[in-house]
Amino acid sequence: GQIEHLGRSYAATDTSNYSVVGFGDIVYTKSPTGDFPYGIIKQSHIQDNVAVSPLYGVYIPVNYWLGYILHTYFQYAVNVTNYLLPIVHKGAKNTINISNEVFLSNSLYLPMDEEEQKRISELFIVVDREISLLQKDLEQEKLKKKVLMQLLLTGIVRVSA
């Protein structure tokens, strides 16, 4: 069947061992990238269910809020490394071998009260939105600077002393 991931379609001959990722699920990408030598752990914010290959670990948190706390915690490479280093085995060609059971075998100190989880994650959500807006503002300012520099360098705009 056709598998769609990140806007691209892939043909897979056998999808029987694929996992379904739902909104709010935690997804572990078992491939090293950049600052994340043991892979990336994120919460899915895609509204629709998505099929993913067995190269991804898919975990359903107790609730969305706890998932968001984990998503925020694992945004930092040091946290992912500290969590996975003791339990992961790197194989040939840097492949990461870890079962779902082993992935869940490590522990973190997390709030257990759902109301507390909700309040903490709502704070993270507000902060994430603020950061996103500030990044967009920064990109706009960089664009303005670029346009102004082009205008100045071409002599279209002159600065008076």
Model-derived regions, located:
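Short, solvent-exposed loop/turn positions at domain surfaces
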Residues: 9-15, 92, 114, 125
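Short glycine/proline-centered loop/turn elements that form peptide/ligand docking sites
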Residues: 2-3, 33, 141
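Sequence-specific dsDNA recognition surfaces
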Residues: 1-27
